[in-house]
């Protein structure tokens, strides 16, 4: 609040100090431009996209809000100062024109900075903004520059906001209406086939039930001959089912009685199994003892067999030696003659022809 009050005081001081400058600008502007042009410029200081972007930046950027508040405060103070002073209307209009010209420049600079991160605006909102700006431009054109700076600044802020909100609301209502209409149309179209399918489903089980009864009856061996037969056959089927149920109950009763009779038998079996189990244990002990004895016998027999095998080996070798010695003893003369004959043959060798030739050469 203090900051706003200080801005108000500064704007009032500037407005009082600069009226002659605006008069000169007004004289030059009136000579160059007709009276309708400034009203159009003041009426449309912002393009439609800029108004939308300013709206989008207001909830997010605190700096944009402060700048907009400053501009609005300046315009309102200029309007109040122009009304308070009894000067000509041209000065007020020129002052409003100057403020309105400054506003687009500031807003354009701000929009260029904010337009980069922002996403594109919806086309429906752009159309509604254009229509609102055109509506705001019409009354200023008719008044030919008479409205003050406050009037020229208002359509940019409040009037442009209201139609856009109304247009957006209308668009949302139209969209919601269309969606509801489409949704209402769709379920109605879907409900009918569902009901038909449910009807067909209801009919099918009855048909299946009839077919099942027919097949069961045909399996029982009965012939189908008409409606009267259908009414009679269930009775026959009931009669045939009753004896089967009686037979099943009898079997169940017999099955129940059998375990009762079998219970004492089980006790006897347990009694018999008791001594038999003890006998089996004794039998296993005796078998183990027999197995141990057999192992001992096998060991002893193995040892004896090994000893006997060695004994037989010794006997065989001794017999062979005795036989050799016996033969050698009886044939000792022949053996000695054979051994000595070899020596004799070497000494008593007959001379050869080579030996005679050598003797002849020597002589």
From Swiss-Prot:
Keywords: Cell membrane, Glycoprotein, Golgi apparatus, Membrane, Phosphoprotein, Repeat, Signal, Transmembrane, Transmembrane helix. Residues 253-269 have a biased composition (Acidic residues). The modification Phosphoserine is found at residues 42, 220, 277. The gene is Tgoln2. The keyword DNA repair does not apply. It comes from Mus musculus. A motif (Endocytosis signal) lies at residues 356-359. Glycans are attached at residue 303. This is Trans-Golgi network integral membrane protein 2.
């Amino acid at each position: 609040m203090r900051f706003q009050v200080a801005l108000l005081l500064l704007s009032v001081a500037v407005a009082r100090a600069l009226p002659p400058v605006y008069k000169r600008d007004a004289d030059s502007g009136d000579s160059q431009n007709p009276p309708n042009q400034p009203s159009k410029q003041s009426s449309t200081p912002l393009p439609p996209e800029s108004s939308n972007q300013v709206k989008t930046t207001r909830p997010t950027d605190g700096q944009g809000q402060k700048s907009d508040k400053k501009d609005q405060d300046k315009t309102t103070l200029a309007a109040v100062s122009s009304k308070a002073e009894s000067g000509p209307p041209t000065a007020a209009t020129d002052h409003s024109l100057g403020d309105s010209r400054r506003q687009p420049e500031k807003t354009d600079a701000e929009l260029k900075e904010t337009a980069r991160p922002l996403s594109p605006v919806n086309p429906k909102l752009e159309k509604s903004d254009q229509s609102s700006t055109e509506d705001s431009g019409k009354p200023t054109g008719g008044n030919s520059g008479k409205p003050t700076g406050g009037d020229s600044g208002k359509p940019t802020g409040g009037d442009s906001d209201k139609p856009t909100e109304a247009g957006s609301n209308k668009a949302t209502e139209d969209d919601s209406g269309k969606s509801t209409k489409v949704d209402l149309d769709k379920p109605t179209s879907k409900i009918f086939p569902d009901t038909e399918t449910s009807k067909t489903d209801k009919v099918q089980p009855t048909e299946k039930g009839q077919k099942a009864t027919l097949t069961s009856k045909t399996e029982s061996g009965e012939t189908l001959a008409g409606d009267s037969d259908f009414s009679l056959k269930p009775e026959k089927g009931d009669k045939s089912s009753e004896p089967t149920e009686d037979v099943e109950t009898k079997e169940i009763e017999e099955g129940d009685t059998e375990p009762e009779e079998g219970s004492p038998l089980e006790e006897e079996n347990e009694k018999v199994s008791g001594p038999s189990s003890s006998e089996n244990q004794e039998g296993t002990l005796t078998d183990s003892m027999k197995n141990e004895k057999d192992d001992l016998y096998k060991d002893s027999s193995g040892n004896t067999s090994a000893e006997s095998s060695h004994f037989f080996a010794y006997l065989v070798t001794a017999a062979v030696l005795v036989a050799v010695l016996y033969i050698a003893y009886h044939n000792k003369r022949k053996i000695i003659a054979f051994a000595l004959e070899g020596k004799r043959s070497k000494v008593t060798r007959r001379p050869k022809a080579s030996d005679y030739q050598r003797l002849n050469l020597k002589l």
